[in-house]
Swiss-Prot record:
This is Co-chaperonin GroES. It is found in: Cytoplasm. GO terms for molecular function: ATP binding; metal ion binding; protein folding chaperone; protein-folding chaperone binding; unfolded protein binding. Heptamer of 7 subunits arranged in a ring. Interacts with the chaperonin GroEL. Induction: By heat shock. InterPro entries: Chaperonin_GroES, Chaperonin_GroES_sf, Chaprnonin_Cpn10_CS, GroES-like_sf. PROSITE patterns: CHAPERONINS_CPN10. Together with the chaperonin GroEL, plays an essential role in assisting protein folding. The GroEL-GroES system forms a nano-cage that allows encapsulation of the non-native substrate proteins and provides a physical environment optimized to promote and accelerate protein folding. GroES binds to the apical surface of the GroEL ring, thereby capping the opening of the GroEL channel. Its main location: cytoplasm. It comes from Brucella abortus (strain S19).
Length: 98
């Protein structure tokens, strides 16, 4: 896991997808063409937070290293340092795993 030279702004979060198993519990191998994109990932970087109506900074609940679940269509796919990552708002994250 290489350090990325990117700092998201405001309430945005950079997430690395966590690949799912290539085999089912019954031992059937799933080809790449039949796999869905994983909806679980690891937070790589997080912004400082959003501002409320009064202008006060509201920090994010997630931090680098957190394992998160997100919606199937959440985020924008980007390539940073040769690695495919997602940038999404914290509100697109459904929850923290563990």
């Amino acid at each position: 896991m290489a350090d990325i030279k990117f700092r998201p702004l405001h309430d945005r979060v950079v997430v690395r997808r966590v690949e799912s198993e290539a085999k089912t519990a019954g031992g059937i191998i799933i080809p790449d063409t039949a796999k869905e994109k994983p909806q679980e990932g690891e937070v790589v970087a997080a912004g400082a937070g959003a501002r409320d109506e009064a202008g006060k900074l509201v920090p994010l609940d997630v931090k680098a290293g957190d394992r998160v679940l997100f919606g199937k269509w959440s985020g924008t796919e980007v390539k940073i340092g040769g690695e495919d990552l997602l940038i999404m708002k914290e509100s697109d994250i459904l929850g923290i795993v563990g």
